[in-house]
Structure formats: structure tokens, C-alpha cells
Amino acid sequence: LAFPGLTPFEEVFQLKAAHYIKYTNGKLSEIQYWKPQKCKKIHYQEEEQYKDLVVQTFRKCVEDLLRPGTQIAANLSSGLDSTSIVSIAAPFLEKRGEILHTYTSIPDEAHDYESDAYFVPDESSAVKKTVACFPNIKSHFIDCKGENALTHLKKFVEEYDLPIKSAINLSWIYQVNHDAHARGCT
């Protein structure tokens, strides 16, 4: 973190992961309740068993967040993170007869993107391939043509009480949140 412990609120600080604060006799003390280096090590015979455990743990983490009876939405790029989450969430929701709304940014064609061999400004074709694998995904492609980070700034500040990390994506974030809210998504 660039500024460990700091939050956007005056005199409100963030604790380190796996810590809590104890107040005793007028003194604050920070106590670590979990130490990853002290966890029991797992020893398997086969490499495949480690892979299975990672997938099983990841699957449980994703599925535990999918509350029944609500519309679920996810941001979907062609990256590993969002694609992995969507690839687990979609079949799980399909078993419950539910759909998954996904949101993908479509870049402004007028913008001059850097020519970098690893930079993909328009990820929509790869996203469409992912979406094609899951019949219960309803994909939404958000075009912020002619907008920039300042377009929705005033409305954003009025509606959200916290700063965001990637202000360059503010217009897209604002539109996704409003569209998802209108659809009843969480």
C-alpha cells in the first residue's frame, strides 16, 4: 500500500490484515490473531491434489458470495481474474436458474492507445468467447464515447462517499453501477 493504515476519513485508520485492536486501561494495543507462516502445511503425494485444492477453495470463495434471490453482476474483461470468477459463478447460478450480468468496457475508438504488444484496448472479442461458453450470462458492453473522468464527477461525489483508486475509469464505473442498480443487481 502507498499509505499503510490511512483511510479517506480523518482520524480513522485501517488495521493490518489479521489484526484487531484491544483497549485496556486507557491503552490501545494491536494484536495479530492469525499468522500464515504458522499454518499447518499440507503435503500431498500428487501435484494434481494441490491443483484440486486451489480450485476447490477458489470455487467455495466465489460461490459463498452469490446470494440467492438477487440479480448478480460482475465486471468482465479478458483477464484471468474476472474470467476465472465468471467461469465459476455462471454454472453455479445456472443450477439455481439464475442469470449473471457481466459488464465490459468498450474503449473510445477516437482515443489513441499506446502501441504495446501486451496492451489490448478492446477486450470485447475475448469477452464474447467467454460469454459464449455460458448460456446464462447476459453481457452488457458499456461505451463511454466522448466521456472522460470528469464527465460524471459531480454526480459521483454526491452518490459515493469514498474516493476510488482508478479515477481514469470513473465514467465507466459510474455507468456500470447505474445500469446494474437499475437491473436490481448486487
Language-model features, listed with the residues they occupy:
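N-terminal segments that mediate ammonia production and transfer
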Residues: 1-45
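ATP-dependent adenylate-handling active sites, centered on carboxylate activation for C-N bond formation
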Residues: 37-186
